[in-house]
């Protein structure tokens, strides 16, 4: 929830590399302590203080002076900063008893906006001139009474990372560790293209703060009995707003001096705020008896979420031409708002939890063979329900539910076999509970059709035409229409009654062998099968089978089903399960050491064949439903994953040298990488533009679901009777 494209809840890694003592990657761990993930687990161990005071100071710079300034003989000038300043300091608080370690990192990145008006010096100059931009700006200020601001020439991203670790040795049997991390940052995000011009007001600031603290108590009760008690709390706050403020509308001019022009608050940032808090408790016992290591544990995770997300809260007006814009004549309009008129009343505020129990036995059968068997039970539940939409339940026969009680039983089996003095093999098979983005759960609490409603020019009530009142705030009649809208006359998201928490079944085999001449090799094979969570739409014009939408009986000439989704911005999308995506990966690594291990050459290859039903690349239901190509969006078939990298070759050469003494090595690293690109597939678009007309009505798609442009292209054969060529 609230993650950026990099996968972090921040602009860059929230972890200062100087704070890391060691890192491990587990793709398919046999241990039942690990769950609630999809691709794997990355673990970090932070550095702790010692009896000696030590510290470091660092500076990093990769600004414009480190970049080329010519492309095909043409010289470009631009301003770019990319700097980081950091320090670490650690030592004893009480010698042999208590220690501390502190890190701090401050980063700043500025990038030029790649598109700008003619003569601006931008890397890609557009056809629109600065004088024309100024004219549109003056029209906006004079006609509509607000300033769209000027042209953003740079974007800026700032972030500060702070971490503190304190270790306290209570006595010889009890050890206490406290960790604290704070990440604060913000960024200005701007857009542009050869055909689209964005005023600075159409960009947005994104502010982020993540605050994490944890405490761990490890106790040795006997030589064969160890306990761990762990508690952590993580809170995040994210804000998104236009530089022009939050009380300005969104304007879009389809043709102004040959460009599409965007002004005002981005429709997805007009009301967009997020606050989450995650509490995690873990109690674990480890007991050694004979050749067995028995582990038992209990975990409780609580997610507390507050999310405000209203699309186009202050209205979104489209104008066909600049003349229409100057005259105040819009061609389309839509808005969403809380029925009460108060933003806070539209917030999704709910809590859900994960309770886990596990038991595992690691058995040293012999000096060469170790076996692992474990079982883990995960239960997801919530006492909070979305606002009940009685009209939805009456229409479809079930309630617009949130996350109800759903559970999974995970079983893990593992084997480690030392074949001989130079080779061993590891085999793991197990089931793993998947990690679902909390935003998919939150959608059901945000879009219930009870607290938020929509209004558009396509279904405007008599006497309430917003097309001639652009930019003066939401007309009173629009606010009244939203307040009194029927309960089904809105976008509604829900979690299907049949939904079960998805899991993965994974087989992992790893073979390792030492080779002559200081070489070693590792070969890994992984095969997994994933049950997927994905969205389906139920207002298709066809009946349901329980809560499952049925396949339409009417088909297009190429055989794909025709859905009768005629509503605009009022679709009903549910989170369902479907089976199955599959992944098959093989990798091989060869390492060669030189100079007593101070120089290491590593060569590796990874190949994968990965299929999925839906990439689920977004946060909203409509984007997830329609952005991954399909023939039948409600009944998807496995296809090549949008994340697949079919082939990857990596070579690294690391060499240590001791210019400043044996305890201060300097490391040089050379890296080579070659890999396949991400998959692509041809699609066709059945929508002509923003006027609402389709090139063909054959597929019945609603463009607000993003599926009008994601239909996989039908490729006719010679003399194909389905096509007229």
Show where each model-derived region lies.
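A beta-strand signature from Gram-negative outer-membrane beta-barrel systems
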Residues: 4, 14-60, 84-97
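Transmembrane beta-barrel strands of outer-membrane/channel proteins
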Residues: 57-63, 102-106, 178-182, 229-233, ...
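Short loop/turn motifs that connect adjacent beta-strands in outer-membrane beta-barrel proteins
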Residues: 32-35, 49-54, 94-97, 173, ...
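Short, solvent-exposed micro-motifs at the edges of structured domains
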Residues: 500-503, 518-725
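Solvent-exposed loop/turn elements at secondary-structure boundaries
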Residues: 385-574, 579, 695-699, 704-713, ...
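Hydrophobic, lipid-facing positions within transmembrane beta-strands of outer-membrane proteins
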Residues: 11, 38-40, 83-87, 160-164, ...
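Transmembrane beta-barrel wall of Gram-negative outer-membrane proteins
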Residues: 78-186, 205-233, 376, 411
């Amino acid at each position: 929830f609230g993650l950026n494209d990099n996968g972090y809840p921040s602009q860059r890694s929230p972890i200062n590399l100087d704070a890391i003592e060691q890192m491990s990657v587990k793709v398919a761990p046999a241990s039942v302590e690990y769950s609630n993930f999809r691709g794997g687990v990355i673990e970090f161990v932070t550095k702790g203080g010692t009896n000696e005071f030590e510290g470091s100071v660092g500076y990093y710079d990769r600004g414009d002076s480190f970049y080329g300034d010519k492309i095909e003989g043409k010289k470009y000038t631009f301003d770019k900063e990319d700097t980081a300043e950091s320090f670490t300091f650690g030592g004893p608080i009480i010698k042999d008893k208590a220690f501390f370690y502190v890190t701090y990192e401050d980063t700043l990145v500025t990038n030029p906006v790649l598109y700008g008006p003619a003569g601006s010096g931008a890397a890609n100059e557009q056809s629109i001139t600065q004088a024309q931009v100024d004219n549109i700006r003056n029209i906006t200020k004079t006609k509509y009474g607000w300033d769209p601001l000027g042209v953003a020439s740079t974007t800026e991203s700032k972030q500060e990372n702070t971490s503190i670790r304190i270790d306290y040795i209570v006595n010889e049997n009890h050890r206490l560790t406290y960790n604290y991390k704070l990440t604060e940052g913000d960024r200005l995000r701007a857009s542009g293209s050869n055909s689209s011009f964005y005023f600075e007001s159409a960009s947005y600031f994104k502010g982020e703060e993540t605050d994490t603290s944890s405490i761990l108590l490890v106790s040795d009760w006997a030589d064969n009995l160890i306990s761990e008690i762990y508690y952590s709390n993580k809170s995040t706050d994210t804000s998104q707003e236009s530089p022009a403020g939050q009380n300005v509308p969104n304007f879009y001019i389809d043709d102004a001096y040959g460009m599409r022009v965007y002004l005002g608050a981005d429709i997805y940032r007009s009301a967009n705020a997020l606050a989450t808090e995650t509490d995690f408790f873990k109690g674990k016992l480890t007991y050694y008896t004979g050749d067995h290591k028995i582990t038992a544990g209990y975990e409780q995770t609580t997610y507390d979420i507050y999310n405000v997300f209203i699309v186009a809260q202050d209205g979104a007006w489209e104008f066909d031409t600049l003349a229409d814009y100057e005259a105040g004549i819009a061609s389309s309009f839509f808005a969403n708002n809380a029925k009460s008129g108060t933003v806070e009343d539209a917030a999704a505020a709910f809590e859900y939890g994960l309770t886990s129990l596990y038991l595992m036995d690691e058995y040293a059968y012999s000096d060469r063979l170790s076996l692992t068997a474990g079982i883990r039970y995960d239960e997801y539940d919530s006492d909070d329900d979305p606002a009940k939409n009685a009209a939805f339940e009456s229409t479809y026969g079930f309630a617009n539910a949130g996350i109800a009680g759903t559970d999974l039983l995970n079983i893990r089996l593992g084997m480690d076999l030392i074949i001989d003095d130079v080779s061993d093999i590891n085999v793991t098979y197990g089931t793993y509970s998947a990690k679902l983005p909390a935003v998919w759960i939150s959608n059901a609490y945000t879009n219930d059709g009870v607290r938020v409603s929509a209004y558009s020019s396509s279904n405007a009530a008599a006497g309430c035409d917003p097309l001639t009142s652009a930019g003066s705030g939401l007309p009173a009649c629009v606010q009244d229409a939203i307040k009194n809208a029927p309960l089904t006359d809105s976008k509604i998201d829900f979690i299907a009654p049949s939904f079960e928490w998805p899991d993965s079944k994974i087989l992992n085999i790893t073979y390792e062998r030492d080779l002559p001449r200081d070489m070693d090799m590792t070969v890994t094979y992984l095969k997994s099968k994933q049950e997927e969570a994905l969205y389906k739409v139920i207002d298709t014009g066809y009946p349901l089978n329980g809560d499952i939408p049925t396949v339409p009986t009417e088909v297009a000439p190429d055989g794909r089903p025709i859905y009768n989704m005629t509503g605009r911005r009022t679709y009903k999308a549910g989170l369902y399960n479907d089976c199955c995506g599959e992944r098959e990966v093989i990798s091989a690594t060869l390492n060669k050491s030189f100079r007593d291990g101070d120089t290491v050459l590593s060569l590796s290859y990874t190949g994968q064949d990965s299929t999925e039903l839906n990439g689920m690349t977004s946060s909203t239901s409509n984007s997830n439903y329609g952005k991954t190509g399909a023939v039948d969006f409600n009944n998807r078939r496995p296809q090549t994953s949008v994340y697949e990298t079919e082939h990857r070759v990596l070579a690294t050469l690391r060499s240590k040298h001791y210019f400043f003494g044996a305890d201060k090595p300097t490391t040089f690293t050379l890296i080579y990488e070659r890999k396949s690109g991400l998959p692509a597939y041809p699609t066709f678009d059945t929508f002509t533009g923003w006027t609402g007309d389709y090139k063909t009505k054959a597929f019945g798609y609603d463009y607000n679901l993003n599926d009008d442009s994601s239909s996989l292209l039908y490729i006719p054969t010679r003399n194909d009777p389905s096509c007229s060529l």
